[in-house]
């Protein structure tokens, strides 16, 4: 692909959808994410139903996070040197098998053969397997997108990609909870497997693209090249660091149940609206960005978005009104979605085709760890300094990180997207 190709004139917001492969790619991502998010909710429900132990829920996340983060760099190396369509077929088939095993162990017939005490360890093992697949999934999909669309459409492809992910992340848990409540665990797993199968079918509509990276040195040196590239690129390292620290300090969403029950007194119904507010803000903003792109001066807009994200967190922490809190959570999701689009576009634009898997793997290690640790940080600070001060502290630190980044990268705020591509800063 020509690395000098960049935006010369505006394309319509639907331009990227004219590419059949991208439509198949988008369908694959949506249906897989839908099934994945359904399954995440259902596994949590089922494990807690069997154990009545909150620690067991924490172990579910740990069983997935450890292999996903641990294998990320190797997954990026494999993604770079492999044909992406074939790799994704193997990854999705592995997830399909893990889900099938969980379906089998939850059927009433199997309860006569498998003691209840064995079911939870089997679930943990299957979640561990899905975590391994996740370590290959992110770098493979990131690398593939660059092979199916021209470079000038990267900003729009990132917007559509993130929008479909957000939409699936909202609808998946909602559908999972409803189906589980009305029809039970087994039927829910049948639905999950159906959606995974649909995503598998979408892969068959993708063309086979030869890898752009042929390793000529040891695997250790190849992996090191990906890490070194990120740390030498000022803008890419800054974008990843901003994401890491904003998620780490801005993980106040983990404290929503405390606000719903103890501060706003709105109960579980209000909690549902609070969780939906941020996601709704993100989805609507992403849809707007398919028409009005934030990529005029991306680095400046990224810093503004992160600052707005931190400010909305502070205000949400101080709010005593339920409806004002919903507005602030909506704004938090909106600002976050802007930063997501800009970061993903910068990554697509600055990463050489033969290093996309490894660079995506480094990004996954940054982000994959920050979500879990951010939730832990919010819980720990809430215990040490109480809930409201903890949220205000997190938002303040997010703004501080954005301010420090601005001082260190002031020269980047004036660059347009085309200038960033030309300078590859």
Question: What do the predicted segments below correspond to?
Answer:
Residues 7-67, 228, 232-278:
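Helix-loop boundary and gating motifs at the non-cytosolic
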Residues 30, 114-136, 244, 312, ...:
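Hydrophobic core of transmembrane alpha-helices in multi-pass small-molecule transporters
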Residues 70-74, 81, 85-97, 101, ...:
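C-terminal transmembrane bundle of multi-pass solute transporters/carriers
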Residues 126-167:
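Cytoplasmic helix-loop-helix junction between adjacent transmembrane helices
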């Amino acid at each position: 692909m020509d690395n000098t190709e960049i935006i010369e004139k505006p394309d319509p917001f639907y331009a990227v959808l004219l590419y059949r492969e991208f439509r198949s790619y988008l369908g694959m991502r949506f249906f897989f994410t839908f099934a994945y998010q359904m399954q995440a909710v259902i596994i949590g429900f089922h494990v807690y139903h069997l154990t009545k132990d909150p620690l067991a829920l924490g172990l579910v996340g740990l069983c997935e996070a450890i292999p996903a983060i641990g294998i990320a760099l190797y997954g990026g190396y494999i993604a770079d040197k492999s044909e992406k369509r074939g790799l994704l077929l193997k990854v999705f088939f592995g997830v399909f098998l893990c889900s099938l095993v969980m379906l089998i162990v939850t059927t009433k017939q199997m309860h006569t053969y498998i003691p209840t005490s064995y079911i939870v360890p089997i679930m943990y093992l299957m979640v561990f397997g899905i975590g391994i697949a996740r370590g290959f999934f992110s770098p493979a999909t990131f690398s593939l997108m660059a092979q199916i669309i021209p470079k000038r459409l990267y900003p729009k492809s990132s917007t559509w990609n993130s929008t479909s992910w957000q939409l699936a992340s909202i609808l998946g848990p909602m559908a999972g909870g409803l189906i589980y409540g009305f029809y039970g665990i087994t039927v829910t797993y049948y639905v999950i497997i159906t959606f995974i199968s649909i995503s598998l079918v979408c892969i068959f509509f993708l063309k086979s693209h030869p890898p752009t990276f042929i390793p000529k040195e040891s695997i250790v040196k190849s992996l090191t090249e990906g890490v070194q590239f990120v740390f030498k690129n000022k803008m890419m390292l800054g974008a990843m660091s901003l994401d890491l620290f904003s998620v780490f300090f801005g993980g106040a969403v983990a404290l929503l149940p405390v606000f719903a029950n103890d501060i706003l007194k709105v109960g579980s119904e209000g909690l549902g609206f609070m969780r939906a507010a941020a996601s709704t803000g993100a989805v609507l903003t992403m849809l707007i960005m398919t028409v009005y792109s934030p990529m005029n001066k991306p680095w400046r807009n990224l810093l503004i978005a992160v600052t707005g994200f931190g400010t909305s967190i502070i205000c949400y922490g101080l709010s005593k009104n339920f409806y004002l809190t919903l507005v602030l959570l909506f704004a938090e999701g909106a600002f976050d979605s802007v930063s997501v689009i800009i970061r993903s576009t910068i990554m697509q634009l600055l990463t050489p085709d033969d290093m996309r898997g490894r660079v995506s793997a480094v990004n996954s290690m940054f982000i994959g760890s920050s979500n879990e640790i951010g939730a832990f940080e919010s819980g720990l600070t809430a215990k040490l300094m109480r809930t409201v001060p903890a949220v205000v502290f997190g938002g303040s630190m997010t703004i501080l990180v954005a301010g420090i980044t601005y001082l260190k990268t002031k020269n980047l705020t004036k660059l347009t997207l085309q200038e960033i591509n030309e300078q590859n800063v």
